């Protein structure tokens, strides 16, 4: 009940299908991350945060309506174990537990973009604004792998044959929330602009 109140006070509803048996402090950090980014991006709709069993390789997921964030219940047990698993293969940008919720909030925020720009468009604009260099999509993906994470450059083919990069915004948001740099800060500034903020 205390955790429900803690979340509600921050505008987050805990969606607990099953009792929470993890580390309450770790869950509070996830709640704080969701609440911080909800406020920063002026998200008015209520957001739900929940936990459930997932494949051990998955740390979280976001519902298709962009209103529910799920964290793998295993990632909410012991911070040291979670952070060791996050950094094990260097596949993800996050190396702290807070990076998980920040990544999932990136999916929520992606649904708020109003000007039709993709994460790839915003990243290319970021590189130009910071370094003065115009880059191709292919160069952008290489830079993402090199400077953000391998996962950030993951390409998903859509049913209509168009390839999309759905992980750029979540991964850069994760970086900006946990260990910001001049590129992540500029990316977030442009992302806010794309969301009409």
Please provide the spans of the model-predicted regions.
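Active-site-flanking segments in enzyme catalytic domains
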Residues: 1-197
């Amino acid at each position: 009940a205390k955790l429900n109140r803690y979340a509600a006070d921050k505008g987050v509803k805990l969606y607990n299908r099953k009792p929470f048996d993890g580390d309450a402090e770790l869950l509070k950090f996830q709640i704080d991350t969701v609440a911080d980014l909800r406020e920063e991006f002026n998200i008015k709709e209520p957001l739900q945060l929940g936990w459930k069993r997932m494949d051990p390789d998955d740390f979280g997921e976001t519902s298709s309506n962009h209103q529910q964030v799920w964290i793998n219940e295993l990632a909410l047990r012991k911070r040291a174990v979670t952070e060791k698993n996050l950094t094990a293969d260097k596949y993800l940008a996050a190396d702290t537990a807070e990076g998980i919720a920040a990544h999932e909030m990136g999916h929520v925020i992606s649904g708020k973009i109003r000007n039709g720009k993709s994460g790839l468009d915003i990243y290319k604009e970021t590189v130009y604004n910071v370094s003065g260099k115009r880059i191709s999509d292919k160069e952008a993906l290489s830079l993402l792998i090199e400077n953000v994470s391998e996962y950030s450059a993951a390409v998903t083919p859509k049913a209509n044959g168009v390839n999309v990069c759905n992980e750029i915004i979540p991964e850069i948001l994760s970086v900006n929330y946990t260990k910001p740099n001049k590129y992540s800060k500029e990316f977030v500034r442009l992302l806010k602009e794309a969301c009409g903020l």
